[in-house]
Every structure is written in structure tokens, then in C-alpha cells.
């Protein structure tokens, strides 16, 4: 886990919908603290009969405080799970029993009060991470969708916000929306604090900079021999390049 986090830009901590916060959850979170990585919590197995999403949210808030902010909530959990409310986009996502591409609709009237309450909490949490957004929030009591995304991005960078998503991974329900969020909202590597090399010098993530690689794993594969895995921290690496450590 620690090895993977060293080459990860944003960590997604997966929670089993049956059990919520476990020892592994706490250990993984501590690793992200040490490495100063942004964190997203992801609750899976919403179709399990023992899943209690509201209780899991309470567990997360008890463990990690008010920085835990849900982006989504399921309308119902258990074997009949097939819909959730996204309080960033303020839309209902629903699926056919086999999952796949969602149907996106307006939020039904019976869910609007809960959705608005969670939306306002998300707006406030997003505003807290940017002085300009906070001023606008105080003046208008709202933010645009793009402003919310920017506030969430800054909150992730500063570890001032831990968004919560929910999925039923086995049926491909919610996964595509999560991937969309990762593409549109999570911080770019260029926005994150600079890393240092073994000489204590900062390494800027510049494609035109000097070649700098971080080797994070070496394994021995049958019929191949040693295989090393690395992340390019700066510069470019091409097949056949000779690199000096």
C-alpha cells in the first residue's frame, strides 16, 4: 500500500458497505497522512443487505471529522439498490438491474429536501478552501458548479476535504460517474506539492525537464527475469534510452 501511494496522485480508500470503517481503513488513511495525499472515500457493495450508508457516513465523520463530505447518497441500499442522488450535479442516477450506463434525471420531489441539505453542506465545504469562493458564498449563499469543482479541488490538495462517493462495483453502478469526477475535479500532479529527489532537490513535473524516475517495485518474472516498475517524475523516457542512476 505504501509503495502504491508513493506513485499515486490521489488515493481512493475503499469501504465495504457491509462493515464501514475497519482497521484497514484507518491504516490506509494514516499512510495518506504521512505522504500528504488527497483522499476520496468510496463506499462499495451498496446492494448488500447489510449495507447502511448513513451509518458509514457517521463512522467516517466520527473518525475524520467535518472534512468528510458526501458527494452522493443512495436512495436505498440492499439487493434492490439501483439509484443514487449526486448532490454536486443535483441529479438522480439510476440503473437497470444489469447496471451499465445510467439514466440521469431530475431529483424526485420526495428526495429534494435531503438533497438540498447535503448540497448546501457541500457548497459550504467547497467555499472554505478558497478565500474568494468564501466571500462569494457569504454574499450569495451559493456557488456555480464550476466554482464548486474548483473549491473541491483545492480542498483535496490541502486535505481540507475528503469527498465520499458510493458505487456497486460488481454491477457497474456509479463507477462511470466516479471516473468522470476523477477526470474533471481531482488535482493535476502540477498542482500538488513538489517532491524531492535523493539529493534533496525539488523535482518539478515538467515534460521538458531532465529525466527523473521513481522506481517503486522490482519483481522476478518467469522467463523474463527482473522487471522494474517506475513512474516518470519529469522529462521523457523512450525505449532504448540509457539512464544513469
Listing of model-derived features with the role each one plays in the protein:
Residues 1-245:
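Structural and coupling elements of P-loop NTPases
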Amino acid at each position: 500500500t505504501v509503495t502504491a501511494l508513493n506513485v499515486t496522485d490521489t488515493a481512493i480508500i475503499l469501504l465495504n458497505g457491509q462493515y464501514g470503517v475497519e482497521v484497514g481503513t484507518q491504516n490506509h488513511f494514516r499512510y495518506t497522512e504521512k505522504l500528504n495525499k488527497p483522499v476520496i472515500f468510496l463506499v462499495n457493495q451498496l446492494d448488500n443487505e447489510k449495507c447502511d450508508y448513513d451509518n458509514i457516513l457517521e463512522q467516517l465523520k466520527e473518525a475524520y471529522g467535518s472534512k468528510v463530505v458526501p458527494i452522493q447518497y443512495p436512495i436505498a441500499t440492499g439487493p434492490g439498490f439501483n439509484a443514487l442522488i449526486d448532490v454536486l450535479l443535483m441529479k438522480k442516477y439510476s440503473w437497470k438491474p444489469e447496471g451499465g450506463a445510467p439514466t440521469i434525471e431530475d431529483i424526485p420531489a420526495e428526495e429534494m429536501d435531503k438533497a438540498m441539505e447535503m448540497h448546501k453542506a457541500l457548497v459550504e465545504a467547497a467555499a472554505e478552501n478558497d478565500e474568494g469562493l468564501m466571500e462569494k458564498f457569504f454574499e450569495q449563499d451559493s456557488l456555480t458548479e464550476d466554482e464548486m469543482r474548483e473549491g473541491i479541488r483545492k480542498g483535496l490538495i490541502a486535505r481540507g476535504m475528503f469527498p465520499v462517493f458510493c458505487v456497486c462495483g460488481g454491477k457497474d453502478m456509479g463507477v462511470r460517474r466516479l471516473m468522470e469526477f476523477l477526470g474533471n475535479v481531482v488535482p493535476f500532479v502540477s498542482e500538488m506539492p513538489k517532491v524531492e529527489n535523493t539529493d534533496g532537490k525539488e523535482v518539478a513535473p515538467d515534460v521538458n525537464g531532465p529525466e527523473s524516475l521513481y522506481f517503486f517495485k522490482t519483481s522476478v518474472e518467469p522467463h523474463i527475469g527482473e522487471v522494474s516498475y517506475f513512474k516518470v517524475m519529469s522529462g521523457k523516457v523512450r525505449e532504448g534510452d540509457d539512464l544513469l542512476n
